[in-house]
């Protein structure tokens, strides 16, 4: 079942076209990997999916459907709750770990302290972080390591009860142990959420993604099951990129 359907999507920043006639679908409860060199349109696609591109000099054409409904007919706050975005550099809010976790739920609803505590605990456990911070909830979030901060961002997103979690280079600059923890978290959550993972690390896409899309210069060059893309690609450019001949 398709969670997201994209049809003939074009995105412009001024006179520069960032996405060119993109059509693809995202299955519910899959990890979709998106690979490609810098400036290939990967991050622009994520920003289009929750309308972060909406700035004065950007314009878009085409259709993006979430559960069969045009995202432009969904209130922006609801859309961004349902389709969360985690950036390459962890964005922690000023204040404690607990305040970072509780900010979103408190902003969107009136909630009792006990219910809020339960949301925070569940989300931190789901993000594989609870055991490391359960005795530090009143510490500043800035005291966490880079990998912990990234998992805090995942937990903060989970606290909003999303349906799709988009991750833009979430392991950029992290050590192998931190990377493995984030990948393990994705696998553990996959039965309940849909993931879109942008990565410049082709090995990470090969390890984690059910299907992989290869972008180049704003175009979708190849899109198929990950094993097929990495072992028998249809386009020579895909093979060249995967084998490190460019990028």
Model-derived features: where do they sit?
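Conserved ABC ATPase signature
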Residues: 139-144, 148
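Catalytic Walker B motif of ABC-type/P-loop ATPase nucleotide-binding domains
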Residues: 165-168
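Helical segment within the ABC ATPase nucleotide-binding domain
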Residues: 179-191
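ABC ATPase "signature
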Residues: 223-224
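Conserved ABC ATPase "signature" region
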Residues: 114-134
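Conserved catalytic motifs of ABC-family nucleotide-binding domains
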Residues: 161
């Amino acid at each position: 079942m398709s969670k997201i359907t994209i049809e003939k999507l074009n995105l412009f920043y001024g006179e520069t076209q960032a996405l060119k006639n993109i059509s693809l679908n995202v299955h519910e409860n899959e990890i979709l990997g998106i690979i490609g060199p810098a400036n290939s349109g990967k991050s622009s696609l994520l920003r289009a999916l929750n309308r972060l591109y909406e700035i004065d000099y950007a314009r878009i054409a085409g259709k993006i459907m979430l559960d069969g409904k045009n995202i432009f007919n969904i209130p922006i706050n609801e859309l961004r709750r349902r389709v969360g975005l985690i950036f390459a550099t962890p964005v922690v809010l000023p204040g404690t770990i607990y305040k970072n976790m509780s900010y979103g739920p408190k902003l969107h609803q009136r909630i009792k302290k006990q219910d809020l505590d339960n949301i925070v605990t569940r989300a931190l456990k789901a993000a594989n972080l609870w055991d490391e911070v359960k005795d530090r909830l009143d510490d500043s979030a800035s005291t966490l390591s880079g990998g912990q901060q990234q998992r805090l961002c995942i937990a903060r997103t989970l606290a909003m009860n999303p349906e799709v979690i988009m991750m833009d280079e979430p392991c950029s600059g992290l050590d192998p142990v931190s990377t493995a923890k984030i990948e393990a978290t994705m696998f553990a959550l996959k039965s309940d959420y849909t993931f879109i993972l942008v990565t410049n690390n082709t090995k990470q896409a090969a390890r984690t993604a059910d299907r992989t899309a290869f972008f180049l210069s704003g175009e979708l060059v190849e899109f198929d099951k990950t094993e097929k893309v990495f072992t028998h690609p249809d386009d020579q450019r895909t093979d060249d990129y995967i084998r490190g001949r460019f990028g």
